Structures are given as C-alpha cells and as structure tokens.
C-alpha cells in the first residue's frame, strides 16, 4: 500500500490561508449537468476560482489548486 506523504490541495490551501491569517475557503458546489460537478471559491479580494470534476471532491480539489496557484504567484 502506497501512503503518500503529500498533502492534498485543499489541505495545502487551508494551511497557507491560516498562515497568512486569511479567511478559510468556502466551497460553493453545483451540478450543472448530470455527472459533472462544479465548485467555486471566492477569495477575500472577490476573485473566483473554479474547479470541475466527476465528483464534488474532484471539483473542490481543482478549485483549491487554482486558488493555490494564484496565491503562490503572489509570493
């Protein structure tokens, strides 16, 4: 069994936001088409980060990855 020590993007995002003393993410999940889910996060600067996936978990993960990329770009 392979137990990866890497953190998932949702955990990384939460830890980075806590470190920067920013509000924790709130995910808004929708299912515009059967079998496809969308998740969005709105940042403190009112920027939207969208994720799509075949499950809510996948969509939230992609939204978190997009927000992380934005935050890392600012460093």
PLM region spans:
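Double-stranded RNA-binding/processing signature
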Residues: 1-75
């Amino acid at each position: 069994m392979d137990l990866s020590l890497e953190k998932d993007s949702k955990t990384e995002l939460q830890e980075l936001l806590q470190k920067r003393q920013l509000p924790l993410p709130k995910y808004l999940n929708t299912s515009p088409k059967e079998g496809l889910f969308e998740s969005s996060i709105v940042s403190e600067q009112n920027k939207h980060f969208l994720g799509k996936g075949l499950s809510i978990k996948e969509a939230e993960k992609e939204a978190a990855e997009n927000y992380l990329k934005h935050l890392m770009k600012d460093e």
